[in-house]
Design a protein with these regions (language model features):
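Short strand-edge motifs at loop-to-beta-strand transitions and within beta-strands
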Residues: 21, 71-77
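Short, solvent-exposed loop/turn segments enriched in Ser/Thr/Gly
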Residues: 28-35, 82-90
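Short, acidic/polar linear motifs in exposed loop/turn regions
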Residues: 41-44, 83, 97
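Terminal connector regions
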Residues: 85-111
Length: 111
């Protein structure tokens, strides 16, 4: 409908210092957490609608509040290995930024 397309029209821009973070090598039984920082560089509020992960081993915590222009939001990504081995996980962030969905990646080796 018309309303949806108008909502779609409210876009902002974001900057992410790094979209790809390595957790390095770690004991597979130890939970690992890293932070991705999304900075709202546009002129509108940034709203994160949804964050999807490629498996249950990866969870993401973040503030559900809209992010004001020039402010940032931290996405705290926690990885709990199900077994030892290398991993490469994608996190999809759906938001009202031009580049949505944003793909974030974590890699590493659980030993």
């Amino acid at each position: 409908g018309k309303a949806a397309s108008e909502r779609e029209g409210i876009r902002t821009k974001i900057n992410i210092k790094s979209t790809d973070l390595s957790l390095g090598a770690f004991d597979w039984q130890q939970e690992q957490t890293v932070e991705f920082i999304l900075e709202n560089t546009g002129e509108r509020l940034l709203v994160i609608n949804d964050v999807l992960t490629s498996c249950d081993c990866t969870t993401v915590g973040y503030s559900k509040e809209p992010v004001h222009p020039k402010d940032s939001v931290a996405l705290s990504v926690t990885y709990m290995a199900e077994q030892p081995g290398r991993f490469d996980k994608i996190i999809k962030v759906y938001c009202n930024a031009d580049s949505s969905p944003i793909l974030l990646r974590i890699t590493g080796e659980a030993k």
